[in-house]
Amino acid sequence: MYLLRIRSIASRARAGRRQSFGVFSSFAPNSSHILIGDAEKRRVWTAGLEYSHRLWGNDSLRLDYEGSVSPFFQERDPTVVATYPTVSTVGLISYVEALPSIGERVVYATNNPVGYVGLGDGSIVYVYAVYGSTKTYALAISPLGARVSGFSSHRLQPTFSADLGMVFSSRDLPVDGTASSNFLFSFGPGMQLIQGSSAIRLEYLYRHMSNANSGDYNPGVDSGVFRLTLSRLRTR
């Protein structure tokens, strides 16, 4: 009877927590056309702070407001580091067509030809690219967010989060001619484990970054993101 009473008190405490303060890190190992973004092969790391506050809840279900800021936001974009033709063209080139510049960040890091050169005899030779990566640093804020948690009186809880914010970078993202200010939204499921006044949450999110056609070009970036959050829970 005494143990049941202790468990009941602990369950009510988990369901009754009002707010939390946390630190998080996320990693997107790749990007592709998942839903609406086109830019490929981006890697993004973030780290920051999260705040959440209960909006509504009972022993079974809970709705929280959540907001976050990521002072560390690093994106690695595929970049042309060299180009080469399939055969030697020394002294034979009469014109060059549609080759990317060395150091240019590209939307698609393709194994297909990136251009061609015309030879004096009228034939053409296709040119391929060698890719490296370029780092761009940014600040991300997501002031509008919500998280639904199931089994809110239990230690292990399924969650679903959705966040909306912006990214402010030191140069255009993901390529030149886009924009240095981009909109950001993400959503996806997760699992949260609560132990006393602490919690750990692991999520897998779909995230999209876009300038909403405010730049000359808007390829957009779609990523699958792993996010890990460590939180301190408070009842006031």
Label for each model-derived stretch:
Residues 17, 41-47, 135-142, 156, ...:
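Residues that define the transmembrane beta-barrel architecture of outer-membrane proteins
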Residues 19-23, 61-69, 158-164, 183-187, ...:
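Transmembrane beta-strands of outer-membrane beta-barrel proteins
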Residues 193, 220-236:
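Outer-membrane beta-barrel "beta-signal"
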Residues 33-38, 128-133, 171-177, 211-218:
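Extracellular loop and loop/strand-boundary signature of outer-membrane beta-barrel proteins
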Residues 25-31, 69-77, 164-172, 206-210, ...:
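Transmembrane beta-strands of outer-membrane beta-barrel pores
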Residues 42-171:
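Gram-negative (and chloroplast) outer-membrane scaffold detector with strong preference
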Residues 37-43, 78-91, 176-182, 217-223:
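Flexible, surface-exposed loop regions and adjacent strand-edge segments
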